[in-house]
Amino acid sequence: PVLCSYLLNRKSTDKKVEKEAWVARKLKELYGKALNGALIHKKIVLGCTIGLFLIALGTFFTLGRSFLPPFNEGSFTINVSSLPGISLEESDEMGRRAEELLMQVPEIQTVARKTGRAELDEHALGVNVSEIEAPFVLKDRSRDAVMNDVRKKLSTISGANIEIGQPISHRIDAMLSGTEANIAIKLFGTDLNLMFTVGNQIKEAIQGIPGLVDLKVEQQIERPQLTITPKRELMAQYGITLPEFEEYVNVMLGGEAVSQVYDDGKTFDLTVKTSDESRTTMEDIRNLMIDAGGKKVPLSYVAEIRSVTGPNTINRENVQRKIVISGNVSERDLRSIVNEIQQKVDASIQLPEGYHIEYGGQFESEQAASRTLLLTSLMSLLVIFLLLYNEFKDAKESGVILLNLPLALIGGVFILKLTSGEVSIPAIIGFISLFGIATRNGMLLISHYTHLRTVENVPLKQAVLQGSMDRLNPILMTALSSALALIPLALNGDLPGNEIQSPMATVILGGLLTSTFLNGFIIPIVYLLMNKEDKE
């Protein structure tokens, strides 16, 4: 206001009003004719708009659902895993074979591989797992086409499970479900062998679902193990308590840190344990001497030592044993694939008593985020209504302004259907932002109608016509400026860094288009109908 008082004097403003641009004059002329026609055929206009809204609402429920849109990170992260227990040499050879196949893809110029990771690494891996980073440069093919080519080539490696993703996407999946895949089917139970059998049955049941790729069951093999079971009666005869026995076995076989040594600025644990030569064979372990009331006796006197087989790993969640059947999504939305998985599992898998399945990964996060955003959007609508009511002091006028929300929803839904065909979390955030933006146009019209009727004493219908014409330019200018700012984001969704912004911009752009166009007809019609009593 201060700048306007200095820069816009009355004389120059009057000249500009007299010399209104021909585009604005033409638009007002066309809009005036269209608005008069709409006011004559109110029922037809309202009926068509309601029909559009119902179609958009039905279309919304047919759209696919996903947590986040696919990222374009410019690099593939590929996990090549075989059965635990494979030698480092065999795993390295398998990794080299994968590298050779990757280099046959034209878009990939270089690869980098890690086979296994150190035990103290924050993401420790056995030597049976190779992690390959393969940067790519897109040429004539899309990212999905290149990924499918990579997947097809690597599927020729026998005895290997392949997972293909991208660096950040892999980390997100790992944080969400503990597995580096989009979908994690978690099977909980007690018997690991039975769980592994049921897990393979689930894999076979869902193997042919379109769009489900990189399907695998968590690797489990039986490995030789040594069990040492105390003989309690003999321990009592020799005067050995159970805590003493447990500490002895831990120290002799596992070692115990008793102090620390500083050397050259570094700290090392001083560990007490038996020598490696003294525990090479089972017979060596049987002959280890244990203190027994002032004398020593062989360990085999007071314990049963047996060689058995057991699982290489036991994973738990909330104290329950679990195995994971994991998979990725390709060229299809996440929600529909998970729904089909649930249908096939429910129809073909009979779970033993005490066993149950949970679906995790991006699907679980998408459901939780959608519920949170739905609650947030309802709260925001309530706040918007209260603010409008506080300003206009009229529930009817506040309700008329909120009619812009379904008008905006129409464009947002249709533009999603024409572009990605999926509703992701960024798209939902776009809808919430759109609802706030869309109320602006209704406020401009209603506030001007009220001013004309109360201050200038203009009759109802004339106030609606004149107010709509007066506010045409401001509404179009604000909508156009917002749209022009959003177009670059909406059109460049494939560029790295724009993947999340693009769905939001697309939804807002489509909603602005329909809300701006329909706002100029629906708000005047509804305002006129709701104020008939005042006119009479």
Give the positions of each predicted feature.
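Solvent-exposed, membrane-proximal periplasmic/extracellular interface segments of envelope transport
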Residues: E89-T179, E233-G255
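Signature of alpha-helical transmembrane segments and their immediate interfacial
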Residues: V17-P69, Q109, T156, A160-N161, ...
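Hydrophobic, well-structured modules enriched for small/aliphatic residues and gly/pro motifs
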Residues: P1-S12, I425, F435
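Short beta-alpha connecting loops at secondary-structure transitions
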Residues: K15-K19, L83, I429-S433
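Residue-level recognition of strand-loop junctions within catalytic nucleotide-signaling folds
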Residues: L83, G116-R117, V137, K273-S275, ...
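Short, conserved charged micro-motifs
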Residues: S87-E90, D140-V146, L194-T197, R332-I337
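C-terminal transmembrane helical bundles of large multi-pass transporters
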Residues: K153-E533
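Transmembrane helices with small-residue packing motifs
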Residues: R10-S12, I50-S87, R141, S177-N182, ...
